[in-house]
Regions:
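Intrinsically disordered, low-complexity segments enriched in polar/charged small residues
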Residues: 7-8, 53, 250
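Divalent metal-binding pocket/active-site signature
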Residues: 158-160, 171-256
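Short, linear, compositionally biased motifs with a strong N-terminal bias
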Residues: 10-11, 173
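N-terminal hydrophobic targeting/anchoring segments and the immediately downstream early-domain regions
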Residues: 17-199, 253-414
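C-terminal motif of bacterial Sec signal peptides marking the signal peptidase cleavage site
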Residues: 13-15
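Sec-dependent signal peptide recognition
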Residues: 2-10
Length: 414
């Protein structure tokens, strides 16, 4: 419903041209009613929603306003409505085990199960959610009043060495694929795996993965990739890369962030950085000593066990212990201002054509003042205060992602 106004605005912009960016403090009255009204007219997407991890939890109801304690439920339908979030990329995340055939098979089954859970969400709530597989789907679904569900893969480890599985996941709706996660794998070097030997960026199998994704029309997500892997991906890929949840290292030097020089290369290649809101990646936050001790004990208890070898009871026990630690010894939070510093710095370096939002909701993201997706209008308010235009906001909140998706679709056709 809200997007009917957006469609009319798009026609007017096409006839008259987009507005020029106002100077700071000019152009828009950012009184609460006005910035919220504008925000809810925009097509608002996030490129990294870890919410599918909650779908197997019997206590989770996507239609309910679930308790929003940080680290638990940050995305559900009421919060999306309040925050003007139209949807985005719902993540198929699979933890990594040993690099062997048995573990690959177990990981593949886990990833397929998660993919099916996303489809089941849509089947159970067809009036609220719809699967999107093309760039044009986003506007249509949002205009219908439903939430947009694109699928993405975080960590291609479950593919094993069978690249035919990329097409299998494509046929199941996946349109964004990340080769690697916290550890080096069969495809690429990870930004955070400091113990393993250097694979040289992409392995030969990793290069094949990128080419196959290009052939199918999938976008490439280089978040979690080492710098060498990111540069190799840009060299091999025929389409620009997406950094679905990443920060800038010039403000906080963390392996998950990238330098200004590398960010400029991503932008020159047509890519986009979607700014992460995971506090420990954007600010030096010291965890409580009790938390470190408890997490170490939990790690030692499950040391050497592949996550796919755990029984359902063991998995539930592990997750319950993790949740107990999170609630008893929570990590200190970063702040909304620190998050916005990250976004504004990226905008200053590469401009609004190459920056977006990928806060890592339900996967560790969220800061004080922006604890869940209901707080997203605050980002629009701040960007307006900084002088960014409605046209800029349209790009930042989803337009840049859809541009790259259209490029991927065109590359497939060619």
């Amino acid at each position: 419903m809200k997007k009917l106004i957006l469609l009319m605005s798009a026609l007017l912009l096409a006839a008259c041209g987009g507005p020029s960016a106002p100077e700071r403090g000019e152009g828009y009255d950012v009184a609460e009613q006005n910035y919220r009204e504008l925000h809810h007219r925009l097509l608002v997407m996030d490129s990294h929603l870890d919410t599918p991890a909650n779908l197997s939890n019997p206590d989770f109801d996507i239609l309910a306003d679930n308790p929003s304690k940080l680290g638990r439920v940050q995305v559900d339908l009421p919060k999306m409505e309040r925050g003007g979030l139209d949807g985005g990329f719902w993540v198929i995340y699979t933890p990594q085990g040993p690099l062997n055939v048995t573990s690959y098979e177990a990981a593949k089954l886990a990833a397929l199960k998660r993919s099916d859970e996303i489809l089941q969400l849509i089947e159970m709530h067809p009036n609220e959610f719809e699967l999107a597989t093309t760039a044009d789907d986003a506007e249509r679904i949002a205009a219908s009043g439903k939430k947009i569900v694109y699928k993405s893969i975080e960590n291609s480890y479950p593919l094993g060495t069978d690249l035919g599985m990329i097409e299998e996941f494509y046929n199941r709706g996946v349109r964004l694929i990340g080769p690697v996660h916290f550890m080096d794998n069969q495809f690429a070097d990870s930004a955070t795996d400091l113990s393993a030997s250097d694979l040289g960026g992409l392995t030969p199998l990793g290069e094949e993965l990128i080419r196959e994704a290009n052939r199918l029309g999938m976008m490439i997500d280089a978040s979690h990739a080492a710098d060498s892997a990111l540069e190799a991906i840009m060299e091999v890929s025929s389409t620009p890369v997406v950094l679905s949840h990443t920060g800038v290292s010039s403000l906080y030097d963390h392996p998950r962030n990238i330098s200004d020089d590398l960010l400029r290369k991503v932008a020159a290649d047509g890519g986009v950085i979607q700014i992460n809101a995971l506090g420990a990646y954007i600010e030096d936050l010291e965890p409580p000593a009790e938390r470190v001790e408890a997490m170490q004990a939990l790690s030692e208890e499950f040391s050497g066990i592949s996550p796919f070898d755990l029984s359902s009871n063991e998995r539930e026990r592990y997750l319950a212990r993790r949740q107990e630690i999170n609630e008893t010894y929570p990590m200190p939070l970063s702040s909304f201002d620190v998050f916005m510093d990250q976004m504004l710095h990226a905008l200053a370096i590469v401009g609004p054509d190459h920056v977006g939002m990928g806060a890592d909701w339900d996967g560790g993201g969220g800061v004080a003042g922006m604890e869940d997706v209901s707080d997203l209008p605050k980002v629009t308010e701040r960007l307006l205060e900084e002088g960014y235009s409605k046209e800029d906001l349209e790009k930042i909140w989803g337009g840049n992602l859809l541009r790259i998706m259209r490029q991927a679709e065109a590359a497939k056709q060619n």
